[in-house]
Regions:
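Alpha-helix initiation/capping motif
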Residues: 1, 26, 46, 83, ...
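An N-terminal structural lobe/cap that precedes and organizes the functional/catalytic core
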Residues: 1-80, 154-189
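Active-site-proximal alpha-helical scaffolds that flank and shape metal-associated catalytic sites
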Residues: 52-116
């Protein structure tokens, strides 16, 4: 969607209530964070997301949503051309520049991610190694030690299921964000 790239990036990091009208992050970034949170909620509630979370059982069930999100990022990067005419590399470069332009340095007390490094991070999701790097990063942010990296094997083994879910989930998320009526489910069309 057309929203703040910095807000989308900060959506998982910035916690608590945000009022865009008074936020030190600025109205555009604050709105981007709120949109990111809405998209996350909608994605987590999507039937295909729920189905993919079912692939992870036992002690990993608690982290299934995170792994599915990263697995879907991997699937989207791998199937990018099916959803966007702009090459992934060009998109990643454009997005990294936008993040830098919007970044609320004063409010956060730190600089935006380096353009080239951030663009490589995004395009890195095309490879399984990009997914494992993301899972390792999540491990470092968790309060309790959890070994998430091996769960990438499940995503790889179920790659077709993840790649098949990307399109319907994206369509439904865009429809919800743009307030369009839902498309009939496959079973309803038959």
């Amino acid at each position: 969607s057309q929203t703040s790239a910095a807000g989308q990036l900060l959506g998982d990091e910035i916690k608590g209530r945000i009022d865009p009208a008074t936020s030190s992050l600025g109205q555009t970034v604050a709105n981007g964070i709120l949109i990111h949170r809405r998209i996350d909620r909608l994605a987590d509630d999507h039937p295909l997301h729920c189905e993919l979370r079912g692939l992870f059982a036992g002690r990993h069930r608690r982290y299934a949503g995170i792994v599915v999100d990263i697995g879907l990022d991997h699937a989207l990067a791998r199937t990018w051309r099916a959803f966007n005419a702009e090459p992934l590399e060009a998109f990643a470069t454009r997005l990294s520049v936008q993040v830098g332009q919007e970044w609320p340095t004063a409010a956060l007390g730190r600089e935006a991610p380096a353009h080239a490094r951030f663009a490589r991070l995004l395009t890195g999701y095309t490879q399984a190694s990009g997914m494992t790097r993301a899972l390792a990063h999540v491990e470092q942010r968790l309060r309790r030690p959890v070994d998430l990296v091996p769960l990438a094997d499940t995503v790889i083994a179920q790659r077709a299921q993840f790649e098949g879910a990307v399109g319907p989930i994206l369509d439904d998320l865009l429809r919800a964000i743009e307030n369009r009526p839902p498309a009939p489910r496959l079973a309803e069309r038959q």
